[in-house]
Swiss-Prot record:
Located at the top of the head of the 30S subunit, it contacts several helices of the 16S rRNA. In the 70S ribosome it contacts the 23S rRNA (bridge B1a) and protein L5 of the 50S subunit (bridge B1b), connecting the 2 subunits; these bridges are implicated in subunit movement. Contacts the tRNAs in the A and P-sites. GO terms for cellular component: cytosol; small ribosomal subunit. It comes from Koribacter versatilis (strain Ellin345). NCBIfam families: uS13_bact (TIGR03631). GO terms for biological process: translation. The gene is rpsM. The lineage of its organism: Bacteria, Pseudomonadati, Acidobacteriota, Terriglobia, Terriglobales. The keyword Signal does not apply. This is Small ribosomal subunit protein uS13.
């Protein structure tokens, strides 16, 4: 099993699909990395030799950040938005949708489970 950027790539998948298991690498970026590393996309991870894996590692390191560094960057950007008091930071702080979605009826994923009303609690205890 090839280990790239701290992620074990599945051996039975094609390399262009397996690279998308790394946080920060999507389909188009995986194809660009393989082109830069001069590796064919229609090969399985188990068929790669050590030299090809090293070329892929080098291509990923030369590109932008992935995995832990990228997660850290994203969290730092969110913290910065909260600190400067922007509208987006306020929405992050209140755990509400940030990009303008409606919240009157939807947004249950972001807002969490429904908070019961006092009337509902009285009915539940009366039964």
């Amino acid at each position: 099993m090839a280990r790239i950027a701290g992620v074990d790539l599945p051996r039975n998948k094609y390399i262009n699909i397996a690279l998308t298991y790394i946080f920060g690498i999507g389909n188009s970026r995986a194809k660009a990395i393989l082109a830069e590393a001069n590796v064919e996309a229609n090969r399985k991870v188990s068929d790669l030799n050590e030299e090809e894996v090293n070329r892929i590692r080098t291509a990923i390191e030369n590109g932008s950040s992935v995995e832990g560094d990228l997660r850290k960057d994203v969290s730092m950007h969110i913290k910065r938005l909260i600190e400067i008091g922007s509208y987006r930071g306020y929405r992050h702080r209140r755990s509400l949708p940030v990009r303008g979605q409606r919240t009157h009826t939807n947004a249950r994923t972001r807002k969490g489970p429904r908070k019961g009303t006092v009337a509902n609690k009285k009915k539940a205890t009366a039964k």
